Each structure stands twice: as structure tokens, then as C-alpha cells.
């Protein structure tokens, strides 16, 4: 391998190390994100499992409460304690009889006759088991069980029906007579009287009071629009508004037309080092270097294998040493060509909202509005002030008096109301009025709010001893628990003993036939069966 190739290998190694460093940073970031995702998933699974467990426990507790309510209802319907004892005695006798049936029967010993004085014979074989005996008499009734725990508080009862309407109460004593009220408003004018005889023409009476105001007239039509007024003075600049929220990014618009080439800009700052260019072509092979000084003799090597390798005359392969160290990196390659134009970047973020502009000119007046509806009739106005007294007229002639006597005199308008009169004396108390008729039944009111919970009920009776339940099914395996904390690092273990030497391996497969060796010396040494020169040949 030449120096150029070694240089190329060194460059690749340097790039590989740089890439490896970048890959290590990315792998660390990926591992951290995966750990956070796994932790979030574990927490969500744990919360779901906790909710499921709480739901199961709540359902079980509800079932137990329902069972206790049913037992309490049964005890309430059972009746007095005597009936409960009469019901429980036959059940207890039956249970005791079943227990006594299972007990083993003891056989009573029989007396041997006294006449036989023979020596006892050899022991006989064991007899067969006897038949099952009759059931024994029932045993005594057991003691009363321990009192059970207090029952849970009962649910509040349903609200009772609404009661009937109560009877009306007695009439109270008659109160004192009230004081006279204020004078009422003046009454309406009476009907006109009958036509009287024509009277003499009297003097002109005083001028009457002004009549009530007439009804409010309908609003007039809207006037025509006046001429446009002069523009008002310019307003003061307003306070700049607060910065608005960032708007939602809009979709990128269509690409605009290609602009004209711009002028050459100022020289930019030094750019950041670019990414490494593509791998250069391998350089030319350099000249062979000068031979270095001879190295120091190496340490004694380990004992070689005793396996005989047939080199078949390949002396160079037998004398070939280990591969040398890696050479220095080669010279840098030629810089690559300029790349193509990149893709357009993403649209920028919207800028901040600008300051508020100046106030604009006042707008033109709007068109006239529609005609409004007629308003309601207004209240009567206050009476007007009395007018001035008129001048006295001239005396009329006799003919004028006769003609005036024949005219119909119409009654004048009523005068103003007089002042209120003095308060009257207190009247005599009147007789007691009769009782009024009974009123109709009122409509039923709305349903009232729920009543307070009732007092705690008395403790329930002692429950009956329950029968032994069946063996429950094995529960389902529980969920996996949360992973425990990471344990501390253990102590360093002692160094193990040196292992025994392994068994020598099998003989390898015979290799391919080697290439022909170099030409021999003037006096070639004879070759042995292993392909090496005969010992002692090189010393001649």
C-alpha cells in the first residue's frame, strides 16, 4: 500500500471520527427523548391502572352496602325475637346432626366368657371396616354468636306529601276608625241644566282660567339636509396602542416575478467553515522512503504452536513479518466544484404592529333617517296665569239688548277647585261586619327543597350465622408494579483465578498451493518435508 493510499485512509479515518462525534451527540439526544417518552407512557399507564382499581373498589363497596341493606330489611320483616328463635332452632339441629353423622363410631368392648381357660391363640388378621352407623342424637344448641357491627346509616326518606290547607283563623278584633283622608280631586262637570229664561245682559265677567293643553301634535317632517360644514380642527395624536398578539402565519404567496440584478453589496464578514468537501481522488504513489535504523531486539515470544504447516517451498511467506503501522495521512484533495443553488427558505415571521396613524378628516354627514313613530299623548300642562282685566265696553242700545236677550246663553266652564275643608269629627264605631264567604282553594305550591337527613336509626338485630361460602376463584394476576429505584453500584469483586489451559484445536484445512518462489542461490539448500531448508544448510 503506497503513501497516497495511506493518506486517503487517514483522511477517511478523520472524517469517520468527526461523523462519529456528531452521531454520538444525536444518539444521546435521541436516547434522552426516548427516555422521556417512556416515562410519560409509564405514568399514563399507572394513572389508568389506579383509576381502574378505584372503580373496582367502589363497585365492590356499593355491592356490600346493598347486601347490608337487604339483610337489614330482612331482619326488620322477620318480626319479634321469639319468631326468630323458632326459625333458627331447626336449622341449628340440622347442622349439628350433619356434623355428628361424620364422627367415627366407637365399638364397645364385649366381655369374654369365664369358662375358657385356653391360652390365647395367635393374633388374627385385621378385620374389614364395619358399616356406617346410625346417626346419633342431636347435640346441644350452640351459644349465641357475637353481636355484629353497627349497620350503616340509612338513606334519607322520600319527602312526604304536601299537607292539606289549614282552616282559616278567627277574625281579629275590629280596629279603630281611621282618620278622614285628604280631600279628593274635583269631580267631573255635571250635565248642562235646562234652558232658563233670558236674563238681563250682565256685566262682562272676569276672564276664565286657561283651558287644559291640547294633545301633542304629530312630529313634523324631517328637514332637508343642511350644507356641509367646514372641516373641524385636527385632533391630537392618540396614545399608541399596545402590541397586538402575533397573527397566525399565512400561507406563502405565489412566487413573484424575477427582479432585476441588484448592485454589488458590501463585502461580507468571514463566513463559517463549510462542511467537508467530497473525498478527493487518490494521489500519485510516492517514492519509497529510506530504510530506517535497525530496531532493538524484541522480547522473547511465546511458545508457538506445534502444528506443522506445509508451505510447499514458500520461503517468503514463512519469513514474512507482521503488518507495519499505519502510515501518515496524505495531502488534502482538490477542492470540489461549487454546489447548485439551494431551495428558497421558509417565509419570515410577521413583523410587529406599527404605531397608530393620525386621525383622518371627518366624514360626510349621513343620509336622513326614516320618520319616527308618533309619540304617546303628553300629560296636561299646568294652568296658565290669569289674564289682565279687560276694559269696560260701551253701553248698547235697546235694540241690541233685545237681540241679546233672545240669544241662548251657554254655561261657562267650571271654576278652579276650592281649598280643602276642615277635618270632620270622629264618627261613631259601626256594627261588626258579617263573616266573609270561604275563599276558593289555592293552587298547589311548588315542591319544597329536600328535607334534612333524619336521625340515626336504632342498631339492627344480631344477624344469623351465615353458611360457609364456596371457595372463591383465584384472582387474576395483578398489574406490573412501578419500576423500583436504581440500585447503588456494587463493590468491586475480587480477581478470579487463572483458568486452565484449553484443549488444542483441530488441525486446520490445507491451504491452496502457493506461488513459485524466487530463484535459488548458487548452492541451494535441500528442502525438508516441511518446505524449509534443512537445518545447518545456512551455516555452510
Swiss-Prot record:
Residues 185-195, 322-334, 411-422 have a biased composition (Pro residues). Homotrimer. The gene is COL23A1. The keyword Membrane applies. Residues 350-362, 435-444, 486-503 have a biased composition (Basic and acidic residues). Residues 124-243, 251-305, 321-380, 412-460, 463-522 form the Collagen-like domain. It is a single-pass type II membrane protein. This is Collagen alpha-1(XXIII) chain. Pfam families: Collagen (PF01391). PANTHER family: COLLAGEN ALPHA-1(XXIII) CHAIN, SI:CH211-266K2.1. Residues 1-26 have a biased composition (Gly residues). GO terms for molecular function: extracellular matrix structural constituent conferring tensile strength; heparin binding; identical protein binding. Residues 1-28, 109-304, 316-540 are annotated as: Disordered. Its main location: membrane. The chain crosses the membrane at residues 35-56. Residues 57-540 are extracellular. Residues 1-34 are cytoplasmic. Undergoes proteolytic cleavage by furin protease to yield a 60 kDa soluble form that forms a homotrimer and exhibits a low affinity interaction with heparin. One of its GO terms (cellular component) is endoplasmic reticulum lumen. The keyword Lyase does not apply.
